[in-house]
Structure formats: C-alpha cells, structure tokens
Amino acid sequence: MEAPTVILDTCALVLTSMEDAPLAAARFTFAAARHAVVDLAQVLNTSPTTGVNRLSSAEFAQVRGRLAAAGIRVQESTASEQKLEELRATYELFVSALAERIQVSLPPWIPPADVLDDWQTSAWDDQFPSIHQTLNKVMHPQ
C-alpha cells in the first residue's frame, strides 16, 4: 500500500499546496490512484476506516519547509492545509483499511532520519561494500 499512498499523498500536495504545479497531471494521477485503491477495497471487501490522520499541522509545516528549502514554491496559507486535509479524507480511510487488512504499514509523510530506502540496500551489501559506498557518493555528494 506504500506506492499508491505515496502517489496519492504527492498528488494531493501538488493539487492543494504548490504554486506553478502541473495540476492536470496531478488531477489525472490522483483520480486513477484513488480509483484503484477504492476498487481494491471493494474487491477485498474492506470497509473504510474512519478517524485516520497521518499528517499533523506541525508535520505539514515541516513538509512545506522542506519543499521551500528545495526551491519549490508552496502556498503559505492555512487554506492550503485545509484543502489538503479535505482531499486526504477522500483516500486515507481506504488506504488505512487496506493496510490493516493486508498487514502492512503506511508510509509517513516525513521519513525517519538515517533510514536507508529499500533501493539503497540488499542482502549482499556485506559482500560488496563498494556498492554502498558508490551509492552514497552519487546520491549524497559533498
């Protein structure tokens, strides 16, 4: 459930909080991803879960700050946070129920520090330390 959730989160953020964003692409992608999630919930006979909130106001401010630091223009109004909350309410209840049903966790909006992404590690890292070193050099140049 991580991939569709990240897609929905990203589209929702683009649609509600970013300036000069590709809105048409975000709308289409959001609609397709939400449709897939809702259909999957229906196929698995999984009722939506209420009371889900994966993003607090403090975390939203942190997300905004990270985007701004990366040079992405974001809307600073409280209206954008409200719109994001409303849009999240259209899919979080489904992804939360599905995650519970198939016993996986949902991704946080803000990743924990010092945790490697799945693509950055493998079961063979101990045998090939140069791979990890190369990835670090390329992905985190100093």
Regions found by a protein language model. Name each.
Residues 3-142:
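Soluble C-terminal extramembrane regulatory/interaction domains of multi-pass membrane proteins
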